[in-house]
Amino acid sequence: MRIAFLSRHFDPQGGGAERYSVAVAEELAQRHEVHVFAQTFGSSPPNGWTPHKIPGPLRRPRWVNQLWFALTTAWLTHRGFDVVYSHEHSWHGNVQCFHVLPIRYSLLKNRHGWRKALRILKILTSPRLLAYWWLEGARLKGVANGQRAVLAVSEPLRMTLEQTYPVAKGKVHVITPGVSSAVPKSAQDQVSARAALGLPLQARLALLVANDPLRKGLKTLIHALGLLPPEWKLVIAGHIPAASAYCALAEDAGVLERLLFIGPQQDLRWAYHAADVLTHPTLEDTYGMVVLEAMANGLPVVVSDLPYCGISAELSHGSQALVLQDPTDAPELAQALQTLVDQPERMQQLATLGHAWAGQKTWSQCARAHEAVFEQVTANRR
């Protein structure tokens, strides 16, 4: 098949959506002709796929750039491709992948009566919100008759999509992320990784991977850190805008010197190998790829429960992970982390069971599931 990928930022150092699209494209490129249309690409050279850079004359406001990207890619890919696979808000693309909660759901949830009326008025008077509202609805056009397929990266996201858009009920395919490899770290791996990243060799290191740390639970982690012994440090990996704001929060809590920023990582395995535990007290994640990746590297995980994190729909508390009922509860988080120190056998059990579970979810399987959907869509067009 000749496949076009639409993704504004095609970079494995981006968030989960970006890493998902890159991994699937690289897997599919082994068997198909894959073309990627994006405004920015990562530093790594193309791995079997052909890049097409889309100019961005107006990167701000973002909604105008979104319309520009949709219009440009629609013109470039309207013919010559069996599948146009969009990870963006666009009316074009016979396969649409949703990575985040629907805008319509987020704007109107828990709003009734006059509060709902006021929100609708706000939408109607905002070009930005109207653009996103329309673009999102356009992604579902044709799904009822099989001319278009819709994918969700988790079962909870599928349920929310079908609740928000009844036309998609029973039509959304769930294809969860995978991992490239599942090799547990060794003690020597941890020593080497800490040395390479300039991290202390003897400390207890909790890891947070995030480009939006506050939404991923940094505030709770900072307060939890203050409840833990001084040996605990928090390693933060990712693009951290306005780091001073987070430092001020940590300084107020008396833990500033225990925050270790290592920035974005080309290969997160170094960070996973260096840490003792992954902490993911996220406030909103439709899946949580970093949780799966950490497990694949043999790292025990503390993660938010539903409805905060989609991957928790597949996990059992105390088996593959420690699951937090309330991601804003710092004492609960601190207790979970200290439990791993006080009960090393439980820590090892979590790492072992989590690793075994993650090893069953590969990018190869994910790509095969995509192929099945692509074949179904192309067959419906004949």
What are these regions (language model features)?
Residues R19-A23, R204-L227, P241-S244, A369:
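A conserved mid-protein helix/loop that constitutes part of the nucleotide-sugar donor-binding site
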Residues F41, V179-S180, V209-N211, K233-C247:
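Glycosyltransferase donor-sugar binding loop
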Residues L121-V153, M159, T164-Y165:
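Membrane-proximal helix-turn-helix segments that form the acceptor-binding/catalytic region
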Residues E162, K171, G178-A196, R381:
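Acidic anion/phosphate-binding donor-loop and adjacent secondary structure
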Residues S192-A195, T339, R346-Q360, A372:
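A short, well-ordered alpha-helix in the C-terminal region of glycosyltransferases
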Residues P264, L283:
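Aromatic "clamp/platform" in nucleotide-sugar-dependent glycosyltransferases that forms part
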Residues P300-G310:
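Short hydrophobic beta-strand element within catalytic cores of glycosyltransferases
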